[in-house]
Amino acid sequence: LKCNKLVPLFYKTCPAGKNLCYKMFMVSNKMVPVKRGCIDVCPKSSLLVKYVCCNTDRCN
């Protein structure tokens, strides 16, 4: 699986066991992702932070 880094022009290949891509936003500013990368379990969103996870190459 390949996941975009913070700047979507760049990506990395996820290590074994991390088979989801994610991006994280501040709820107050959904237009600007704060983090992107590989993850094993999608974190729950909170009042301040929203996570979006997916499982195809460079989907984040």
Curated annotation (Swiss-Prot):
KW Secreted (keyword) present: yes
Subunit architecture: Monomer in solution; Homodimer and oligomer in the presence of negatively charged lipids forming a pore with a size ranging between 20 and 30 Angstroms.
Pfam assignment, any one: Toxin_cobra-type
Gene3D superfamilies: CD59
A biological process term (GO) from this entry: killing of cells of another organism
Keyword annotations: Cardiotoxin, Cytolysis, Disulfide bond, Hemolysis, Ion channel impairing toxin, Membrane, Secreted, Target cell membrane, Target membrane, Toxin
Gene Ontology MF annotations: ion channel regulator activity; toxin activity
One CC-aspect GO term: membrane
Disulfide bridge partners, by residue number: C3-C21, C14-C38, C42-C53, C54-C59
Coiled-coil boundaries: none
Tissue: Expressed by the venom gland.
CDD domains on file: TFP_snake_toxin
Subcellular location: Secreted; Target cell membrane
Family: Belongs to the three-finger toxin family. Short-chain subfamily. Type IA cytotoxin sub-subfamily.
Entry protein name: Cytotoxin 5
Annotated function: Basic protein that binds to cell membrane and depolarizes cardiomyocytes. It also possesses lytic activity on many other cells, including red blood cells. Interaction with sulfatides in the cell membrane induces pore formation and cell internalization and is responsible for cytotoxicity in cardiomyocytes. It targets the mitochondrial membrane and induces mitochondrial swelling and fragmentation. Inhibits protein kinases C. It binds to the integrin alpha-V/beta-3 with a moderate affinity. Is cardiotoxic and cytocidal to Yoshida sarcoma cells.
